[in-house]
């Protein structure tokens, strides 16, 4: 049976952490997002961003919603006057403020080939890290860049043992793509960076310039609440 295109919508959060609150905040987030039954979005991951590759202290979260209607339901529960913010969610937000000071969010639309949360879990992919690329692309070219990633580049990464976790374009703008890759070991991360300076890596970047204006890669380190963490369990809390 042919695989159905990914029809989900995703919330990507970049969280500014207060002081040494990263571990407590990730645990707080993981307990909400794992095996949830409240109608909210399941958590794909809550990662620590490596300070040597980007801002710190920073946590990145990724949540999966079952399409636009599901997001609308979540917005209704969060913002409408008739319902008010649900008591449990309000309590969660209030407690979270002791560990975070703000953040920046994106709604992401997956490429057809981008795996769902269930597909990531089913493949059993596990890793010590996650390579995140946020690319600025020429207006209107996000889908073409994603198509190239889904063909040539995904195969090249797979040969290195690096599996795709997600490939998305950012909603409400037409100039951004987000890619997430599973890194089995930190040694493979170092190998990836070294190979990027080689013939194949440079050839890919030359090709990508047909669409990409600039990009930024950062290393994300998974917590046990990330579905690709070696110790992840479906019913962990």
Regions from the language model: what does each represent?
Residues 1-5, 23-46, 51-56, 64-107, ...:
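An amphipathic, aromatic/His-enriched active-site/gating alpha helix that lines ligand/cofactor pockets
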Residues 9-24, 110-188, 226-229, 234-237:
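Surface-exposed interaction/gating patches
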